[in-house]
From Swiss-Prot:
Protein family (similarity comment): Belongs to the LpxK family.
Enzyme Commission number(s) of this protein: 2.7.1.130
Catalytic activity: a lipid A disaccharide + ATP = a lipid IVA + ADP + H(+)
GO terms of molecular function: ATP binding; tetraacyldisaccharide 4'-kinase activity
Official protein name in the record: Tetraacyldisaccharide 4'-kinase
Pathway recorded for this protein: Glycolipid biosynthesis; lipid IV(A) biosynthesis; lipid IV(A) from (3R)-3-hydroxytetradecanoyl-[acyl-carrier-protein] and UDP-N-acetyl-alpha-D-glucosamine: step 6/6
GO cellular component: plasma membrane
Gene label: lpxK
Role summary: Transfers the gamma-phosphate of ATP to the 4'-position of a tetraacyldisaccharide 1-phosphate intermediate (termed DS-1-P) to form tetraacyldisaccharide 1,4'-bis-phosphate (lipid IVA).
Domain of life: Bacteria
One Pfam family per UniProt: LpxK
Gene Ontology biological process: lipid A biosynthetic process; lipopolysaccharide core region biosynthetic process
Phylogenetic lineage: Bacteria, Pseudomonadati, Pseudomonadota, Gammaproteobacteria, Pseudomonadales
Keyword Electron transport (UniProt): no
Length: 336
């Protein structure tokens, strides 16, 4: 297990040795708290877009199901007759310049895996730039969205936001509730109280402190042919290689177990690069990966490589709440 993986596991398990890092944690907390205070007071300037901006992010390190939720928000807004644009940091992407408009036929190395996935799945206009406010301005210069979704960027206060949605893994929660580097929190836990909504990935039902949502497997997609097959393509007990380079690989492996398959787990670092050689495992078995990994592997995929398509399914209460927020932010919006 790589050092980063061991550290992540320690954060969520609450390893006692992390107490040694608390002096650094105290310094980190002061820095991030002061940064936020500067923007809230107006001491540091934020850019406010002429259309509503909805930030979808988290305060923890590690995967929370953010990309599937963004896909759900895009499609939900479209069903309401709204045009949606997306901005993202584009973690790991190496575009020729910033800001960069992502197109569906660009390589993942240039566009970033998550932005490319979003564009390939939905076709929305999407701009990547570490400076999210600059990304929004570039998006508005080329398109006319009714609203903009900011993929992550919870801590990017240079971009003013009209709505904040925070996602949390319901199983791992906030770990030991410590800030970096003594724990997995990017901001103190009290920050959750300032968000407009908290969504718990994998919660059985809505909670007093937030809404629930789950990730529902929908199909197997062949990387080479694009063929879409039902989940009964593989019988119960099927052994297969499982590849996940996401923030929480175990969640993906657990999903495969829940489908009654027998995955041989191959966890990789989030946003990891791949090659045919790296993914040539023994014994020869079908290979199933996440959709996020698939956007990087299509150029060299084998015939028996598949990705598991998953869809976010939020609670009915969240859907109703979100529609109310759209009414507030866009009072003259079209009705379906």
């Amino acid at each position: 297990m790589a050092f980063a993986d061991r550290l992540l596991a320690a954060w969520y398990a609450g390893h006692p040795a992390l107490a040694l890092l608390r002096p650094l944690e105290a310094l980190y907390r002061r820095v991030v708290t002061r940064k936020r205070a500067r923007f809230l007071s107006g001491e540091s300037a934020s850019y406010r877009a002429p259309v509503p901006v909805i930030v979808v992010g988290n305060i923890t390190v590690g995967g929370t199901g953010k990309t599937p939720m963004i896909l759900w928000l895009i499609e939900h807004c479209r069903r309401q007759g709204l045009k949606v644009g997306v901005v993202s940091r584009g973690y790991g992407a190496k575009p020729p310049q910033h800001p960069w408009h992502v197109q569906a036929d660009q390589p993942a190395e240039q566009a970033g895996d998550e932005p490319l996935l979003i564009v390939q799945r939905t076709g929305v206009p999407l701009v990547i730039d570490p400076d999210r406010s600059r990304a929004v301005q570039a998006l508005l210069a080329s398109d006319a969205p009714d609203l903009i979704l900011c993929d992550d960027g919870m801590q990017h206060y240079r971009l003013a936001r009209d709505l904040e949605l925070v996602l949390i893994d319901a199983v791992r929660g906030l770990g030991n509730r410590r800030c970096l580097p003594a724990g997995p929190l990017r901001e103190p836990a009290e920050r959750l109280g300032e968000a407009d909504a908290v969504l718990f990935n994998g919660a059985e039902a809505d909670r007093d402190d937030g809404f629930s949502f789950r990730l529902q497997p929908s199909a197997l997609i062949n990387l080479r042919s694009g063929e879409r097959r039902a989940l009964d393509l593989f019988p119960a007990g099927q052994a297969l290689h499982a590849v996940a380079g996401i923030g929480n690989p175990q969640r993906f492996f657990n999903t495969l177990l829940g489908l009654n398959w027998q995955p041989v787990p191959h966890p990789f670092a989030d946003h990891a690069p791949y090659s045919r050689e790296v993914l040539s495992f023994s014994p020869p078995l079908p290979l199933v990966m996440t959709e996020k990994d698939a956007v990087k592997c299509r150029p060299f995929a084998a015939d028996d490589w598949w990705y598991l398509a998953v869809d976010a399914v939020p609670s009915a209460a969240f859907s109703a709440w979100f529609d109310g927020q759209l009414d507030r932010l866009l009072p003259g919006r079209p009705r379906p």
